[in-house]
Amino acid sequence: MERNLRKKRLGRVVSDKMDKTIVVAVETKVRHPLYGKTVNRTTKFKAHDENNEARFGDRVLIMETRPLSKDKRWRLVEIVEKAK
């Protein structure tokens, strides 16, 4: 698979308690099929953070990668914005 064809997601770190792993919550807006209201959907991804640099509340960019563990298939690309 080409490196630039891999999916990328922008989200917020909701947990950094594991070693070399962060949990990133990604929000997407979806229109309800019947009522048409825009609804926020949240999906959590476990991502590999090699240097343990991301902290709780940071906005991060993650990229799809090969399976690294049972449920880790993403890795940290960059920290877009540090938490205050």
Swiss-Prot record:
GO terms for biological process: translation. GO terms for molecular function: rRNA binding; structural constituent of ribosome. SUPFAM superfamilies: Nucleic acid-binding proteins. GO terms for cellular component: cytosolic small ribosomal subunit. Gene3D superfamilies: Nucleic acid-binding proteins. Disulfide bonds: none annotated. Keywords: Ribonucleoprotein, Ribosomal protein, RNA-binding, rRNA-binding. InterPro entries: NA-bd_OB-fold (IPR012340), Ribosomal_uS17 (IPR000266), Ribosomal_uS17_bact/chlr (IPR019984), Ribosomal_uS17_CS (IPR019979). The keyword Ribonucleoprotein applies. The keyword DNA damage does not apply. One of the primary rRNA binding proteins, it binds specifically to the 5'-end of 16S ribosomal RNA. Belongs to the universal ribosomal protein uS17 family. NCBIfam families: PRK05610.1, uS17_bact. Part of the 30S ribosomal subunit. This is Small ribosomal subunit protein uS17.
